[in-house]
Amino acid sequence: MSNADEVTLKMAEAEDAQAVLQLLRQINRETAVVMIDHLSSLTVDDEQAALHEISIRSDCLVLLAMLNQQPVGIVTITKVDEEANAGELGVAVLKKYWNQGIGTLLVNEAIYWFQNYSSLAHLVLDVFKNNSRARHLYQ
């Protein structure tokens, strides 16, 4: 990434479905730590419907880091515990863009959304013990 390149953030919308699926599949190939059930069988129509539903809720978030109009990272907050009203944060960045502050930018923005716009009471985070990059980011 050159100095002239600027990363922007955008809320994922239904029309981003194909790009989101491509991003998630690429990240899954690069890291094997993205945990999305049935990722390989998700269709663009499925993802469009999911992104539309998320866009009208206050307990879910999908935010994209964009570079030259292409997604290079993603952060999600998904409601995981109805009783506790808790959401789980997940973040992933294409390997080519690691160590450039994109993950930190995404996490900070997700926390801001949680604190200012979310209807969730709690935010939780699970990290694989061997994922030292993620542990460092979240600390």
Segments predicted by a language model, with ranges:
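Conserved active-site alpha-helix within GNAT-family acetyltransferase domains
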Residues: 100, 104-105, 116, 129-139
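Acetyl-CoA-dependent GNAT
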Residues: 14, 26-94, 107-108, 113
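Amphipathic alpha-helical recognition patches that constitute DNA-binding helices
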Residues: 19, 88, 133
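Conserved GNAT acetyl-CoA-binding A-motif
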Residues: 86, 114-126
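A short beta-loop-alpha structural element at the N-terminal edge
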Residues: 7-22
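Short acidic N-proximal helix/loop "leader" segments that mark the beginning
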Residues: 1-3
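Glycine-rich phosphate-binding loop
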Residues: 97
